[in-house]
Amino acid sequence: MLITGFPAGVFQTNCYVVATGPGADAVVIDPGQDAVEPLKQLLAEHRLNPVAVLLTHGHLDHTWTAQPFADEYGIPVHIHEGDRPMLADPAVGIGAALGAMIGDQVFVEPEKVIDLVDSEPVTLAGITFGVDHAPGHSAGSIVFTVEAPAVDGAGAPVEGETVTVAFDGDVLFQGSIGRTDLPGGSHEQLLGSIAAKLLPLRDDTVVLPGHGPATTIGRERASNPFLQGLTGTETPAERKGRFGL
């Protein structure tokens, strides 16, 4: 499996590309600000054909170029209905103050939009993506999971073994969690989503967040200060996350 990407725009939002390998169909996750040209270069480098865009949530730093990119290639954009209104009106999800940064730019909904449904996987480009609704950072936040071939310390595939990879947007970061002070955010709900949707995953699950470096569930379970004592029924004292819109 090929999983690659780059940080896009002033918010350094991680845009990911997922495919079964070079020369195959591909899925783009979270094309943010100024992502179109880097995406095209990455797709050309690996001889990939984009077939869909997946959005972890509707905040502008993750969706900025979803419409122009998807419409140029004639491919659908998948998003949870809770965040779909942000595609045409980003200020709905970030508030008036942050919305002022949009200026005179006009946003429209992509020509093809498909609503994601909790616990209903989608198969795209020959890859099955688990779909878990994880509200709290936004009303429609989604965690996508895929099973990728496991590799050893030298990078060689381990026959018959896989590792879960979670694309979790702004739900959980290395050492932090998503902010909850924007419209539709809820700290209590975010912690509940993490407890219900991420912490049950194996410790070796690779987390590819919307901002910052990759991490693992085991590392965050052991060291993330926001998760200490967090289970399916317990929450730590309220704290604020630090990344992303």
Task: Give the positions of each predicted feature.
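Metallo-beta-lactamase
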Residues: 34, 92-98, 121, 128-133, ...
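Residue-level marker for buried hydrophobic side chains located in beta-strands
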Residues: 27, 54, 77, 165-167, ...
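Short loop/turn motifs at secondary-structure junctions
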Residues: 2, 49-50, 203
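Short catalytic-loop micro-motif centered on adjacent basic/acidic residues
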Residues: 26-29, 52-55, 133
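Active-site HxH/HxHxD metal-binding segment of metal-dependent hydrolases
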Residues: 34-127, 149-153, 222-230
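Conserved beta-strand hairpin/beta-sheet module of binuclear metal-dependent hydrolase folds
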Residues: 1-46, 144-146, 152-167
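Short Gly/Pro-enriched turn/cap motifs at secondary-structure boundaries
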Residues: 6-8, 111-113, 133-137
